[in-house]
């Protein structure tokens, strides 16, 4: 595992702040529309903001685990850059959804693409580490010198 994982930690911290901000926006929408918890229905504006936050929250554990796995086992810089792009995609998704349901699509597709790529990188990294550690097969060396 990487000795210094400060890039992954910084992206994780930034993403946690984003999740907190989304929750705060739901709280503001509750006040604006006078919707007391545990109610989750109301005007369409509230429901879109609430749903955008809930969807982001549903994907968050997968994002965090895959970010760290890809960073530890594949490449920290690449994973952190993908993490920043994911945060941007979630921002675009949240604000698009808050405005109109149709405007969420671009951000959603981008974030889904990143959530598809991060696990692939994590699996490649873990497989490479496994082969190296337990079978003494060095993928990186084989790629440099195939024969």
UniProtKB/Swiss-Prot annotation:
Keywords: Endoplasmic reticulum, Leukotriene biosynthesis, Lipid metabolism, Lyase, Membrane, Microsome, Oxidoreductase, Transferase, Transmembrane, Transmembrane helix. The keyword Lipid metabolism applies. It is found in: Endoplasmic reticulum membrane; Microsome membrane. Pfam families: MAPEG. It is a multi-pass membrane protein. It catalyses: RX + glutathione = an S-substituted glutathione + a halide anion + H(+); 1-chloro-2,4-dinitrobenzene + glutathione = 2,4-dinitrophenyl-S-glutathione + chloride + H(+); leukotriene C4 = leukotriene A4 + glutathione; (5S)-hydroperoxy-(6E,8Z,11Z,14Z)-eicosatetraenoate + 2 glutathione = (5S)-hydroxy-(6E,8Z,11Z,14Z)-eicosatetraenoate + glutathione disulfide + H2O. Each monomer binds on GSH molecule but only one subunit is catalytically active. The keyword Endoplasmic reticulum applies. GO terms for cellular component: endoplasmic reticulum membrane; intracellular membrane-bounded organelle; plasma membrane. The chain crosses the membrane at residues 6-26, 62-82, 107-127. Its main location: endoplasmic reticulum. GO terms for molecular function: enzyme activator activity; glutathione binding; glutathione peroxidase activity; glutathione transferase activity; identical protein binding; leukotriene-C4 synthase activity. Disruption phenotype: Deficient mice display resistance to induced ER stress with reduced cell death and mortality. InterPro entries: 5_LipOase_AP, MAPEG, MAPEG-like_dom_sf, Membr-assoc_MAPEG. GO terms for biological process: glutathione biosynthetic process; leukotriene biosynthetic process; lipid metabolic process; membrane lipid catabolic process; response to lipopolysaccharide. Its EC number is 2.5.1.18, 1.11.1.-, 4.4.1.20. Homotrimer. Catalyzes several different glutathione-dependent reactions. Catalyzes the glutathione-dependent reduction of lipid hydroperoxides, such as 5-HPETE. Has glutathione transferase activity, toward xenobiotic electrophiles, such as 1-chloro-2, 4-dinitrobenzene (CDNB). Also catalyzes the conjugation of leukotriene A4 with reduced glutathione to form leukotriene C4 (LTC4). Involved in oxidative DNA damage induced by ER stress and anticancer agents by activating LTC4 biosynthetic machinery in nonimmune cells. This is Microsomal glutathione S-transferase 2. It comes from Mus musculus. The gene is Mgst2.
């Amino acid at each position: 595992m990487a000795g210094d994982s400060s890039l992954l930690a910084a992206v994780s911290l930034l993403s946690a702040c984003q999740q907190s901000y989304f929750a705060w926006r739901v709280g503001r929408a509750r006040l604006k529309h006078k919707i007391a918890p545990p109610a989750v229905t109301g005007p369409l504006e509230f429901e879109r903001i609430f749903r955008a936050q809930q969807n982001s929250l549903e994907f968050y554990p997968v994002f965090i685990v895959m970010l760290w796995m890809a960073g530890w086992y594949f490449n920290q810089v690449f994973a952190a850059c993908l993490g920043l792009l994911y945060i941007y995609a979630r921002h675009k998704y949240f604000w698009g959804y808050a405005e109109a349901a149709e405007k969420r699509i671009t951000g959603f597709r981008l974030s889904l693409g990143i959530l598809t790529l991060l696990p692939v990188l994590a699996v490649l990294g873990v497989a490479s580490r496994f082969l190296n550690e337990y079978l003494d097969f060095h993928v990186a060396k084989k790629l440099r010198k195939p024969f």
